[in-house]
Amino acid sequence: MNTATSTAYSYKVVRQFAIMTVVWGIVGMGLGVFIAAQLAWPFLNFDLPWTSFGRLRPLHTNAVIFAFGGCALFATSYYSVQRTCQTTLFAPKLAAFTFWGWQLVILLAAISLPLGFTSSKEYAELEWPIDILITIVWVAYAVVFFGTLAKRKVKHIYVGNWFFGAFILTVAILHVVNNLEIPVTAMKSYSLYAGATDAMVQWWYGHNAVGFFLTAGFLGIMYYFVPKQAERPVYSYRLSIVHFWALITVYIWAGPHHLHYTALPDWAQSLGMVMSLILLAPSWGGMINGMMTLSGAWHKLRSDPILRFLVVSLAFYGMSTFEGPMMAIKTVNALSHYTDWTIGHVHAGALGWVAMVSIGALYHLVPKVFGREQMHSIGLINTHFWLATIGTVLYIASMWVNGIAQGLMWRAINDDGTLTYSFVESLEASHPGFVVRMIGGAIFFAGMLVMAYNTWRTVQAAKPAEYDAAAQIA
């Protein structure tokens, strides 16, 4: 028995995280559709504090970023680090702890946020006891990941692991520094920082939660699963190394662009803007590297919907990372800030890049860890692809139109200097966009239900003996 386990990959924790990625994806995106409907039809708030938009919106963001995105990152990093190091996970019991610990974090978030327990910091709303639990789980994750790298059977550390490693270390630093707080009761604390300093620390964290959790981590996924699915080596390995160092050097500086025209010192705003513009180069370097990996394999897109998911995610990544630096320019930001354009930009990255690359990776990974040849139905993957693409496009386009309309209406003034439009008029103009956004989100959500069915049928058909056979190290 011991011999078998020592020569078999630790796939159990990968299977658990993969299944929970789909589950939390449905929960988080279902919540997203519901709060989108609340904006279109406010009576859906039901006049209850627990179901109000203000409490459910942070629950939605935490569910899709940390529950769906987090589980996807755990599953794919645990899978690819074993494969690229040709060794089993370091401390499999600790890896099991990261699974149960992370699910507990998600559960506590799902209970505390609707009850109104919040630090009020975006993407870091969870109160201090949960912050401590996150830190403990994250340290365990780092030990497992870097421990596995340390006992690798190959000399080289694959580039995907560099991205996963940077994501794990940076998120740890961001989480600890931004959540330094003084507890006053069991579920209430106050930030250690005040005023503009607090805002700066918050958006250094907030932007780099995007930069490292939702970008570097998912680039780790891209660098493993795109070459695997295309059956081609990375287009330029040298470019991938340059991409890595350039990205992690520049990204950490870009946070102030969230605070243009605020009390933040002007030099800090300008620095954030310049760094955001520089960021275009490494971002597009990575996107081009991923796309060009398909050189000689473009024909596969006709018959392989999994590869289509991965390639379209790269296209959305390219689009989002062009749009982000553009929106960081102060003159553009004067129009876009506080409007739905920002929401559209975020979802170009969240639905188009993060969700699509995760879905593509899961469709590749699930059959591998459950000992199946492929997913239950390739046709259903194709259906999911079109639902996801159409849903994303509707979502983004409606928010672009809304955002630019809002920005123009808010700044329009009459000859005597009074505002041309009242806020309510801009809200009325936004209503059709709210409805289209909800429809786009619902279409994307329908795709997740298709994925859940396909995954369930694939898992149901697998036998425990097949799991073991699939986990054997060749």
UniProtKB/Swiss-Prot annotation:
Its cofactor is Cu(2+); heme b. Pathway: Energy metabolism; oxidative phosphorylation. The chain crosses the membrane at residues 17-37, 61-81, 97-117, 130-150, 157-177, 206-226, 239-259, 271-291, 309-329, 346-366, 385-405, 433-453. Its EC number is 7.1.1.9. Residues 1-16, 82-96, 151-156, 227-238, 292-308, 367-384, 454-474 are cytoplasmic. GO terms for biological process: aerobic electron transport chain; aerobic respiration, using ferrous ions as electron donor; electron transport coupled proton transport; oxidative phosphorylation; proton transmembrane transport. Keywords: Cell inner membrane, Cell membrane, Copper, Electron transport, Heme, Iron, Membrane, Metal-binding, Respiratory chain, Translocase, Transmembrane, Transmembrane helix, Transport. Belongs to the heme-copper respiratory oxidase family. This is Cbb3-type cytochrome c oxidase subunit CcoN1. It comes from Stutzerimonas stutzeri (Pseudomonas stutzeri). The gene is ccoN1.
